[in-house]
């Protein structure tokens, strides 16, 4: 009985530790200040409140222990409401959402900052992960839901600056995962 109780207690502790995996989100303004002290790239999760795949990415990808640890160590992470009412300043430019309708359920007006950073071939989709370098230059937006094991090579490709010397397909041919937790 003691052995079963010990196993259950250990399992509960491990489950609690895994469920506590969490990305340290900051505002876009905070990220810009933090870069001045310790340069890192910025990762922006561009989401909407009505987007199902955005919610899945939050629940499964950003709460994955390996993923959240890697992001926290190597990036400043920003969670950005693509249709939100809040203004922001990025690279000394003010962005607003003049068309935002307070209290509206469902889709709302797209924020100017979203329009500046998230389009791929002129189209905005959610979720979009936007990567920005230490000098506040846009590296790339990546649209669509990413599972933790799909997100790992992307995080490393950007962090290791492989995008400067390799194309994505060539990188993926030789990519080896070093995830030490169960894929989610």
Residue positions per predicted region:
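Thioredoxin-like thiol-disulfide oxidoreductase module
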Residues: 28-32, 65-68, 72-128, 132-140, ...
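Short, flexible loop segments at the rims of nucleotide/cofactor-binding pockets, characterized by
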Residues: 21-22, 56, 105-107
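A mature extracytoplasmic/lumenal domain signature
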Residues: 47, 58, 81-84, 144-146
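Non-globular targeting/processing and membrane-anchoring segments
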Residues: 23-24, 36, 40, 117, ...
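N-terminal "domain-start" segment that seeds a small globular fold
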Residues: 19-34
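Bacterial Sec-dependent N-terminal signal peptides
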Residues: 1-23
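Short active-site neighborhood of thiol/selenol oxidoreductases, capturing the structured segment around
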Residues: 38-55, 77
């Amino acid at each position: 009985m003691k052995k079963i109780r010990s196993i259950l207690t250990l399992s509960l502790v491990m489950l609690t530790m895994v469920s506590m995996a969490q990305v340290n989100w900051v505002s876009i303004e905070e990220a810009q200040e933090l870069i001045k002290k310790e340069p890192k790239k910025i990762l922006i999760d561009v989401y909407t409140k009505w987007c199902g795949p955005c919610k899945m990415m939050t629940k499964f990808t950003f709460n994955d222990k390996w993923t959240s640890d890697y992001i926290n160590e190597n990036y400043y992470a920003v969670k950005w409401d693509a249709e939100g009412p809040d203004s922001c300043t990025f690279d000394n430019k003010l962005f607003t959402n003049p068309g935002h309708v307070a209290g509206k359920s469902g889709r709302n007006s797209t924020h100017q900052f979203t329009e500046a950073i998230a389009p791929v071939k002129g189209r905005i989709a959610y979720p979009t992960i936007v990567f920005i370098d230490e000098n506040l230059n846009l590296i790339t937006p990546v649209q669509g839901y990413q599972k933790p094991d799909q997100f790992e090579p992307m995080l490393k490709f950007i962090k290791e600056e492989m995008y400067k010397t390799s194309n994505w397909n060539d990188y993926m041919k030789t990519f080896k995962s070093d995830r030490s937790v169960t894929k989610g």
